[in-house]
Every structure is written in C-alpha cells, then in structure tokens.
C-alpha cells in the first residue's frame, strides 16, 4: 500500500516524515539536510530553484527569490499586515483581480499557493527518492490559528503540487502527537507553545488513555498568524538599517540587493546570539554613493537584540492566557510545556515561557522536526498502520452568519471539537421578502464587519409572507480539516442552497486546475532538464577517459584506430553543445563502441604478453640449483628449565 507522508509546510523551513513500522522517520533531502528552506527562486534561464539552492543565490537575485510566502497565503492585499510586509521584502507583492495578495515574478503574477506548491513538490520528491515509489497522498500541517481561507489555500497548494491532501492538521496538535506517541504514563495536560518563522500558536492538549486508545484532545487553541521569527528578523533589520542611515544618510530599504544581504546577516546574527553574548554584523560594500563604497559594521549584543524583540515575545503571552481560560484551566494544572518552532531556541523566549507557566519547558522534543513527525503519525492513523491513536482537534475561531443590524450570530463557538455540525432557524427581516443572503463569518467580534468574511450565497424563491414567518434553517458543517460547508433551507418549500465555503477571495476551481497543469508541465520540463544534464555529464566523462586512454596508449594504437576515436570524440563534443537528446545518445553510443573495441584489443594484447612473460619466469625458476635459497645457521637448544 502506498505511503501517506507527513509534511510540515513552514514559513522559514519545511520538513517531511513518514512512518516506518511503528517509528516515524524524518527524511533527508538531496542535500543531506533534514529541513528544507521554504524559499523558491526563478532564474533568468527559466529554472525554478527550491530550498538551499534558492537560498544560496538570494543575494544576487533578490527580486525573484520568494521567501516567507506562507505569511501571504489566504490573505487580502489590503490587509494592514500585508501592507507592512510589502515595505520589508525585496520581491514585489501585488493585488490580484480577486483582491488577494499575490507576487509578481518576471512579469508573471503568481498566487501564494502556487509558490508553496513548489516547496511541497520538493518535499514530495524527497520522500519519493527515499521510499523508491511514487507518493500521491499527504497530511499537511497548518498553524492552529489559520482561518478557513488559509486552510483552503494550503489544500490548493497540495493539489497544485500533485498531492491529495488527506488531512490538514494543526501544527501544535501534530507536535503533541510526536511528543505523546511513546508516552504511556496515563493522563496528562500539555501546553504546546509553537513560535515558528511566521506564526504563533498555543494549544492546550489533554493526552489520555481511553479504552486502550491513546486519545489526544485539544481543549483550546489561540495564536497570531502574523507573529514569528520573520518578525524578529525584521526588527533587527530595521535597527541595522536605521543605524546605517544615521552614519551614512543612506536608506538601505531602497536597495533590494542590500536588503537581501541585510536579511541574511540579521538571521545569522539572531541565531548566533542564542549561544553567544555578542556578535559583529559585518557587511563590506553594502552600497555606494558619489563618495565611494560604504561598509556596514555594527557590534550587536544579546541584550540589544532582546530589547528589540521584547515586545514581540510579550505578544505571545496574551494568547496563552486566553487559551488557558478557554480550556478552563490554571497554569498549575499544566503538566508539561513543549516548545516547537525554531524561534523557541532564543533564550529570551524560553525564559518568558518558563516564567509564565512556572516550569521549565521540555528539551526532548526537536522544535524543527516535531510537527512533521506528528503529521507522519496522523498519516499512519489514516492509512490504518497505527490503530491506537485518536485525535480530537478543534476549530480555532467562532463561525456564524450576519443577522439584522450587522450583528454576527454564532452557530459554532471557537474551540469546538471537529468534525461538528450545528443548525439554527432564522427568518426574514421584511414583509414579503422572497430571498435571503447568507453571509458567512469567522471571528470573535459581535460586529459582523469586524470579522473575516468567508463568503455569501442567496436562498431565493421564498414564498411571500409577513416578516418573521418564513423559517430558514441554516446548517454549518465542519469537516476534520476544519473546512466549512454551509447550507440553507426554506422549511416551507424544502428549497435548499449550499456551498463549500470558498472565500470571496481564494482560487477558483478553474484557477487551481490551470495551476496543476502548469506545475505538471514544469515537472516534465524539470525531468527533461535533469535527463539532459545527466546525459551531458556521461558524455563529458567518456570524452575525458577516452582522451586520457589515447594519450597513455599512443604507441599501442594504429592510425586508423586513433582517427576513428578522434572523430567520435569530436562529433560527441559537437552534439553535447546542442539540445538534440537523440543525437547525443547516438554519438555517445558510437564513442562507447569505439572505446570498448580499443580497450578489448589492448587488454587481449597485454594478456598474451603477460602469459609469455609468466612462462619464461617459470622455466628460469625450474633450472635453479636446489641449494639456492638454503641458509646455514647456528642455533642453541633451549632447555625446559630455561624457559621459566
């Protein structure tokens, strides 16, 4: 049976894992790393680079190197948070026709799910190379606080990458699975504090033994989908840029190349300061003006970095308080605290978490890999490989509809266990009203307009009647992925209307299908590109070995042999310069055959010479006098008592 893989699609890094027997295995990518940078680059010769190779060239190709795309997924261009990011990234974020935030690369507009799909394809390929078989299904993780639009967009990314997304699960829940899989100590309540590259989540999860099953029940979740390591980097970039401007009067924000170098240096300094007390940020030739080149050299202490990001760390505490309140628990009732996400390696974060929860967080969970491991465990549960685990997740935000006076009426409260279904009867607001618009909302505010609009649809042909008489039954149905279906039915006529919520933004079926097709054509191009590269390498290797053999064996070859091989080499060299695969293969075969004949003849010659020489040696040895090689020696007898 084909494996279902688990993918942690992160803002900064991504990771893929699979269950092998009863143990999850994190798979190394082609570069030998267990995590892959979530970076996609488009080169001038139309190659798409993903991961480490994209990151390596980011400084020389800043406007076509896309990072932290997960921060844009499922978001509107006019969102203040997106507007803030526009000023801080070297690539171009633009407004799509549907109002979403997209990116522009090489005069082409691309949706965030398209870019994320490239990262997912890399994860898929990593798993396929390891497993030796095609992978078609995956469990993909998302921040617990992702709304419906963001979950839909992540599912779309999976489809574009050629994966059937069997389940979308929340990152903290996945981390809890990874932690609790082999813990059999009875019931416990854990807090998963997940501060990743772009998002923050806190989940309170109860792990219990119920009828022999390991049950993971999410009691409450909260968070901030625009708070993470990238914001810590941005705070440091702002500080470095402002210090440089003070010294030189030059604003580095206007220079994409300088900004990209600054980003790399900030990230490196931040990581170094998790173990060191101070570091130097040294960027020679960062920019230039009329007076000549300018260099950036700033000494940075851990204390300074902590003062820059203190408010960001403090922002994580309020969601922790809310999650505990929603779970009906106090800090003292939390048995263990687990840290997930690379940013939790920062000493200030660890100290803040320890102070809030009153206990030291556990150190036996790998913050970079736990989420992918949990996704792989859930994948094995879905495929039937693992049978004694039950996962009960929740919807992070309340869901409802807009009712009279612009009020949001909630049908499903936040932190309700999913899957779930809720039905409520509404009526008309005016006499003889023949249609109602069902406006679906997600959020916690009483005012409808202050919440996230997930979509709207009309229920028509309601028989005319005084206001308040018609009975309109509205049903909300959330599946295990946290994705919503809404239906409305006129109880008098039985007329019904339903939609799977596709946000008023988001990608249409046609757009997703077109992107799937585009990704497939790219996959075909990539395959051809790889085949040609391998063929050229094979040809170069053969040319080199033939030229070396001809040089070493010049005296052994006839003029005809030399000429034949030289011609074959020359024709193969010419073919390699072109793009005709069949011609390269043909010329490769000609040279292979010619070199094989040369090798065969020389081997036969050497072999016969060797046999002749061996025969002569044997005959010489047989004529040697028998005494030769015999040596006279004196020896002394050792008596038994002398041995002791």
Curated annotation (Swiss-Prot):
InterPro entries: ATPase_NBD, Chaperone_DnaK, Heat_shock_70_CS, HSP70_C_sf, HSP70_peptide-bd_sf, Hsp_70_fam. Residues 609-623 have a biased composition (Polar residues). Residues 629-644 have a biased composition (Acidic residues). GO terms for molecular function: ATP binding; ATP-dependent protein folding chaperone; unfolded protein binding. PANTHER family: HEAT SHOCK PROTEIN 70KDA. Gene3D superfamilies: 1.20.1270.10, 3.30.420.40, Actin, Chain A, domain 4, Substrate Binding Domain Of DNAk, Chain A, domain 1. Belongs to the heat shock protein 70 family. Acts as a chaperone. Keywords: ATP-binding, Chaperone, Nucleotide-binding, Phosphoprotein, Stress response. Induction: By stress conditions e.g. heat shock. This is Chaperone protein DnaK. The gene is dnaK. Pfam families: HSP70. It comes from Legionella pneumophila (strain Lens).
